[in-house]
Amino acid sequence: AKLWRELAELPTVFVPPLHAREGLEKYNLRIARELSLDGPYPMHSVWTTPRGAFGKTLLLELQRGCARSCSYCTLPQCFGRMRFRKFEAVEKAVDDITARFDIPQAGLVTPEAGDYPFIAPLLAKLREKEIGVSFASLRLDRLTPDMITATSESGRRSVTVAPETGSDGLRFACGKKFTNDLVVEKLAMARGLGIDKAKLYFMVGLPGETDEDVSAITALCRRIIDETGLALTLSVNPFVPKPRTPWSAENFAEVRTIKGKYEKIKKEMRSITKKTPQLRLTGVKEAEAEFRLAWYGYKESAALAAAVENGETRLPEGDRARAAEEIARFI
């Protein structure tokens, strides 16, 4: 197809139907190094429609990249250093769009909205235009009263945050340098500004994790409920090591190990009788599929399809190392 051929000419794009026919090795693919956001690239949705995944929400990009290096996260490697849209450009875009269209809500696209240096004046601008706000990501240690107020004024009574673990030490090892005290403090602030529910993301199977670390998830949830009165929903997911991250060489936990941690959490959560948290546990097979997709290259896809068809669930010995070598050729 014409589109495939045109895309294949770009040095940072891999088009399997074309490239794989002659072998990936002969293509010198590289990661794009465009760092500036001041170029002629769209910063917002071209159009909105109630039939789309985000409905009438206008997606507004503020930032790319990240200054942190969380041990499990691919974002710094994928998007490079942190850089921001100029506030004047974002403000002009909001003015131009609202002059022509009725925009009920803006979705702020950014790795972490609290890192955007102009988040306060932007929220004030959107409030002035009577535009609701939704955040793609909220990091607890960057959460501000303005952000919570914007959330509640938009009609939402829930926030989503990711403590990752109930243990301060293990959270620090993950790269999130904040304590349980701060988690409770920020959620108490949210409660005082009109929020009554919180969704918390946790991981199990982290490197160095102990039974005490797993139990700490329940202990933290109990403390949040006791001190804030929030209703909690927990999303608990197995740790999946990803290429090009500090923890890329760590093991993906065995199925029985993950299931054992899940059972421990379910049992201990039942001991919370006051506003017992709702538990959502990511399926182990789903996490395994994520692991394989992260590590398999094009060459391994046929083996993956056969393994799935045969009911196999683990990455065959040696494939992960070969995938790492193949990924290195893109760098």
Where is each model-derived feature located?
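A glycine-rich phosphate-binding loop feature that marks nucleotide/adenosyl-phosphate handling sites
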Residues: E6-P17, P111-Y116, L138-R142, G205, ...
